[in-house]
Regions:
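His/Asp/Glu-rich metal-coordinating catalytic cores
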Residues: 2-25, 29-163, 167
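Surface-exposed amphipathic alpha-helices with a cationic face
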Residues: 19, 176-177
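Active-site ligand-binding patch in enzyme domains
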Residues: 180
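Long, charge-dense
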Residues: 183-187
Length: 187
């Protein structure tokens, strides 16, 4: 059985697996795919969950909440490629279920790409799943941004970039720092 609400609940083989729960419930195996706020429980003092050490540490830094990392022999953590520490979870039983929160199939400086896995059921987030969402080539956009930054700073200007605080800002920062001619400085 798969149930939406309070994250995603998958019940199989007499166990309850809860992916990205909003509320922590007893007697369930909780999994947190990554540390973006829309994938975290809204309130808890402490909890046990299957997640990466990076995700645990980010939650501690962002929310000052403690998570004890646990494991389960039926659950395999796989790279999701979304942000540092992001994971997909493959639950094996009579049926195999693969859950992904956000994922990325492109290698990035701070993450490994998500790789396809065989499964019976795939549960995925589809924030931009509609055909109307077509994005330009990532490397091309990053190149344009680096050129723009170098041009601004080369004219003794000051550029301020806005990006999501967890994920995009690190990606932009790493990309800009790795360009051939440094363009970042304190403004």
């Amino acid at each position: 059985m798969i149930q939406l609400g309070n994250g995603i609940l998958v019940e199989m083989n007499g166990c309850s697996f809860r992916f990205d729960p909003k509320r922590v419930l007893p007697d369930e195996i909780s999994m947190i795919s990554h540390a973006h706020s829309d994938h975290l429980p809204s309130s808890f003092k402490q909890m046990s969950a299957i997640c990466s050490p990076v995700t645990r540490d980010m939650i501690k830094a962002r929310r000052n909440k403690e998570i004890a990392i646990c494991s389960d022999d039926r659950v395999t953590e796989l790279e999701a490629g979304h942000i540092a520490g992001s994971k997909m979870f493959l639950v094996d039983g009579e049926t195999s279920v693969l859950y992904t929160g956000d994922f990325c199939t492109r290698e990035k400086e701070q993450t490994k790409a998500a790789k396809p896995r065989k499964c019976d059921i795939l549960i995925t987030e589809a924030t931009y799943g509609k055909p109307q969402y077509v994005f330009p080539d990532h490397d091309e956009i990053m190149s344009i941004a680096r050129d723009w930054l170098q041009d601004i700073v080369g004219k003794d200007g000051c550029a301020v970039l806005y990006a999501y605080p967890l994920g995009k800002s690190q990606e932009v920062s790493v990309s800009e720092r790795s360009s051939s001619s440094p363009s970042s400085r304190d403004c």
